[in-house]
Amino acid sequence: MDALTGLNNRRQFEIRIKQETAQSVRKNTDLCCIMLDIDYFKKVNDTYGHAAGDCVLKGVAEIITKTVREYDIACRYGGEEFFILLPMTNLDDAYAVAQRLRQNIQNAKIDIREAKVK
């Protein structure tokens, strides 16, 4: 588990993607994966400090959790990179989820006031 965001971590992702791929092949079902990278994240860290960056990461993780289904598998892969495995999801539906994620993150107002801003 990623200590900062509460999402699965990279190691768990690597285990789960193997499991989900095997299950998808075995059951002949769709499996999609979304890779999400936060634009300009380095600028946030450089301008406001790492505590503010942590607030952004937690905020994005919360948006991901609220946007995807309960059985989808959200992971913080490292830094500002996230992966979401979407079992039993075709490409069109995965695209719709990715667009909802992008829109929800783009429209979010993530509060960094709890961080001691530089």
Region locations from a protein language model:
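Conserved nucleotide-binding and Mg2+-coordinating catalytic segments in signaling enzymes
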Residues: 1-15, 36-49, 58
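Short regulatory alpha-helical coupling segments
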Residues: 10-30, 61-69, 87
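Regular, well-ordered alpha-helical segments
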Residues: 15, 22, 43-46, 66, ...
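Active-site-flanking beta-strand signature of metal-NTP-handling nucleotidyl enzymes
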Residues: 32-37, 74
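Residue-level recognition of strand-loop junctions within catalytic nucleotide-signaling folds
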Residues: 46, 86-89, 106
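Active-site-proximal alpha-helical element of nucleotidyl cyclase-like catalytic domains
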Residues: 52-73, 81, 100, 105
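A short pre-motif secondary-structure segment
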Residues: 73-76, 117
